[in-house]
Curated annotation (Swiss-Prot):
It comes from the Bacteria. This is tRNA uridine 5-carboxymethylaminomethyl modification enzyme MnmG. Keywords: Cytoplasm, FAD, Flavoprotein, NAD, tRNA processing. The gene is mnmG. Homodimer. Heterotetramer of two MnmE and two MnmG subunits.
């Protein structure tokens, strides 16, 4: 819709939605000097965690480390509000190590609101955004502002949509439903239609959340306790953000034969299995009924009981989301050991909502159809706070650069999980909620959480998101790591040293004369912590320095090989494709490739190669066509020959 009413107020950037993507986008744009406004339906539910009150986990923790390395805030908030932390996959290699923190959800939201309120250049507004104002240009529409439910118009040079599950949101308990973005909060009206009027395609997805149970009604003493085991690990690379508060335990129970029978008997009462809705749900976070159907041979499934905060009795029943009616939900809960007397405080529900398939976006997260309009978070088809926060930061950076007339920042797939995720989103026709996984990256040994600062903090500094203090911390850490690696490569443990027998026994290998500490670390089962225990390393050296030096040394051969692979792939995959390339006119491409390439308009050869339906033969044909055009462009005119 064209701007027909004088704006009530004007900003450089408007962010629509106050979830994890919106907060990250708004703070980023404001810190880059843009006059920014964050519009949200409910200022009391800023950065709410409507599902699991947790941050991190496999691949997700790497995303959080990356956002922090660039100057984002999700890692700082998670460190400041953590009530339990664990290292997942600790027995495996560093490529899949993952920090996961249970957070105090109310404290997390409160601290984010405080941060927003004290960020210069950032205004907060509570309103429902229902329309998008645009201005026609020669070749496409340009965003010029937003319109609210009550008719106010706000001008902006860039708008970032981060509406989460609120566009056309509808929550379901059994076959009963109501319009809502999540329990207790109204859905957003009008914005889906506004996008469709501008020519965007929308579709529907589904997600869900389990019931909340009163802690006081659970026999926790009968259940397996899962205490915190990573109090000295943090998401942020900034020690000023580290908080070591009182930790709380989680507990583990399991489904029973009674649980499974109840579910099988009542499947038809869910909205999905009853045929009421057909929206796709998240593959990697299935409902309990999906688990029973998909894994019919399993007698039992593990269920985690996770506290939602220090000052609330609410327990999140992880692994037990369901779309069954409320009375049956209570029966299901009471079929679990330790929950025979469970009091259900909030029922489980599923929510289906409108989303914007992300093939309509550029890698900068700007829409292809409307200049200055960006989209981030669950609206793009992702699931998870971490995925949302990462997209929010990217959209905030690129909205600021759009206004400043600068080239957008593109995150290459091989350089970060952020890049992997965005490349997947804009290249693949995804029709189910997307979550980041370590298996999605071909370069996961390089893309670890511990080295996210080394990969991305220089970029954050160049962008203006890393201040002098953070930069000095980063440089100090690099210098300390280099000194420690040099020490490990030069200091030798002699067979005659007092600790040598104990080291030989632990590693199961003899020391022949002497061995450098670096070679000792390369032995299976020997770690930096063991060097400290044997007095071979300084216990006062910061843990990130010790662990980073160990990984660099222990896996040096693998790291070098993977870096060589990355460099080789870069040379070809980062070749730019012309924005106006007419794929329909390239006869050597298959019909499907012409259609897919023309629809998605990839920006690089690498992105083109990852589009489903585009074969390696098509990429070869495209490369040959580009080379031919390049030679033709370089050839002298016929009359000059």
């Amino acid at each position: 819709m064209a701007l027909t009413t004088a704006p009530t107020e004007s900003f450089d950037v408007i962010v629509v939605g106050g979830g994890h993507a919106g907060c990250e986008a708004a703070i980023t744009a404001a810190r880059l000097g843009l006059n920014t406004a964050l519009f949200t339906l409910n200022l009391d539910r800023i950065a709410w965690q409507p599902c699991n009150p947790a941050v991190g986990g496999p691949a997700k923790s790497q995303l959080v480390h990356e956002v922090d390395a660039l100057g984002g805030v999700i890692g700082r908030l998670a460190d400041g509000t953590a009530i339990q932390k664990r290292i997942l996959n600790a027995s495996r290699g560093p490529a899949v190590w993952a920090l996961r923190a249970q957070t105090d959800k109310r404290l997390y939201s409160h601290q984010m609101l405080q941060l927003l309120q004290h960020t210069p250049n950032l205004a907060l507004r509570e309103a429902m955004v229902t329309g998008l104002e645009t201005t026609a240009e020669a070749d496409q529409q340009r965003i010029s502002g937003i319109r609210t439910y009550f008719g106010s118009v706000y001008g902006a040079e860039a708008v970032i949509l981060t509406a989460g599950t609120f566009l056309g949101g509808r929550i379901w308990v059994g076959h009963q439903s109501m319009a809502a973005g999540r329990a207790g909060e109204q859905a957003a009206e009008g914005l889906t239609e506004a996008l469709q009027q501008l020519g965007f395609q929308t579709d529907r997805l589904k997600t869900g959340t389990p019931a909340r149970v009163d802690r006081r009604s659970i026999a926790l003493d009968q259940l397996e306790e899962q205490p915190s085991d990573a109090a000295d690990h943090f998401f942020s690379f900034d020690p000023a953000a580290w908080v070591s508060g009182e930790q709380m335990s989680c507990h583990i129970t399991r489904t029973t034969a009674e649980t499974h029978q109840l579910i099988r008997d009542n499947l038809h009462l869910t909205a999905i299995y009853g045929g009421v809705i057909d929206s796709k749900g998240p593959r990697y976070c299935p409902s309990i009924e999906d688990k029973i159907v998909r894994f019919a041979d399993k007698d039992s499934h593990q269920i985690f009981l996770e506290p939602e905060g220090r000052d609330t009795p609410e327990i999140y029943v992880q692994g037990f989301s369901t779309g069954l009616p409320e009375p049956i939900q209570l029966q299901l809960l009471r079929s679990l050991p330790g929950l025979e007397q469970a009091v259900m405080l909030r029922p489980a529900y599923s929510v289906d909502y409108d989303y914007l398939p992300a093939t309509q976006l550029k890698p900068s997260l700007e829409t292809k159809r409307v200049r200055g309009l960006f989209s981030a978070g669950q609206l793009n088809g992702t699931t998870g706070y971490e995925e949302a926060a990462a997209q929010g930061l990217v959209a905030g950076v690129n909205a600021a650069r759009h206004i400043g007339g600068q080239e957008p920042v593109h995150f290459p797939r091989e350089g970060s999980y952020i890049g992997t995720m965005i490349d997947d989103l804009v290249s693949k026709d995804l029709r189910e909620p997307y979550r980041v996984l370590t298996s999605r990256s071909e370069y996961r040994l390089i893309l670890r959480g511990d080295n996210a600062d080394r990969r991305l903090t220089p970029l954050g500094r160049d962008l203006g998101l890393i201040d002098d203090r953070r930069w000095q911390l980063f440089e100090d850490k690099l210098q300390a790591m280099e000194r420690e690696k040099q020490r490990l490569e030069t200091v030798r443990l002699k067979v005659s040293d007092p600790v040598a027998p104990a080291v030989e026994e632990e590693t199961g290998a003899a020391i022949k004369g002497s061995i450098t500490l670096a070679d000792l670390l390369r032995r299976p089962g020997m770690h930096a912590a063991d060097l400290v225990r044997h007095g071979l390393a300084d216990a006062d050296l910061p843990l990130p320095v010790r662990e980073g030096a160990e990984i660099d040394i222990k896996y040096s051969g693998y790291l070098q090989r993977q870096q060589q692979q990355i460099d080789q792939v870069k040379r070809q995959s980062q070749r730019k494709l012309p924005a106006d390339l007419n794929y329909a006119g390239i006869g050597t491409l298959s019909n499907e490739a012409r259609e897919k390439l023309g629809s998605i308009q990839p920006t690089t050869l690498g992105q083109a190669s990852r589009i489903p339906g585009v074969s390696q033969a098509d990429i070869t044909a495209l490369l040959m066509w580009l080379e031919l055009r390049k030679r033709e462009a370089l050839a002298p005119p016929a009359e000059a020959r």
